[in-house]
Amino acid sequence: MDTTTSNPRIEASAKYIRMSPHKARRVVDQIRGRAYEQAPMILEFMPYRVCDSISQLLSSAAANANHNFGLSKTDLFIDAIQVDGGSFLKRIRSGARGRTYPIHKPTCHITIVMRMDSGWRNKISLRRFGK
């Protein structure tokens, strides 16, 4: 964690989320670079299961910013967010003639890096929505 107070780097990570990394990346790409206030609204109306895990992680990162640096949630934007593949949960499915077939259930690790907003980023992201 960056301890300088000029523009602190706030991190939060969630590991071993039971979701395919490919499916999680399609949600993460929608909120990368957005202000913190916009991201939960976007996630709330997306129909994907991973949105709940990402919104919990966002609120955790905002709580870290408030507790560790005393920053307000309105001053934050998502600087970087990445999804990495985790290990597979390996299960067995029984097949014909006494055989077994492997089932691989993927997991992923999500890391969010937030920074303090300098003001210009909010104006750009509001223009995207036509406001």
UniProtKB/Swiss-Prot annotation:
It is found in: Plastid. Keywords: Plastid, Ribonucleoprotein, Ribosomal protein, RNA-binding, rRNA-binding. SUPFAM superfamilies: Ribosomal protein L22 (SSF54843). The keyword Plastid applies. GO terms for molecular function: rRNA binding; structural constituent of ribosome. It comes from the Eukaryota. Its main location: plastid. One of its GO terms (cellular component) is large ribosomal subunit. One of its GO terms (biological process) is translation. Coiled coil: none annotated. Part of the 50S ribosomal subunit. This protein binds specifically to 23S rRNA. Belongs to the universal ribosomal protein uL22 family. This is Large ribosomal subunit protein uL22c. It comes from Aneura mirabilis (Parasitic liverwort).
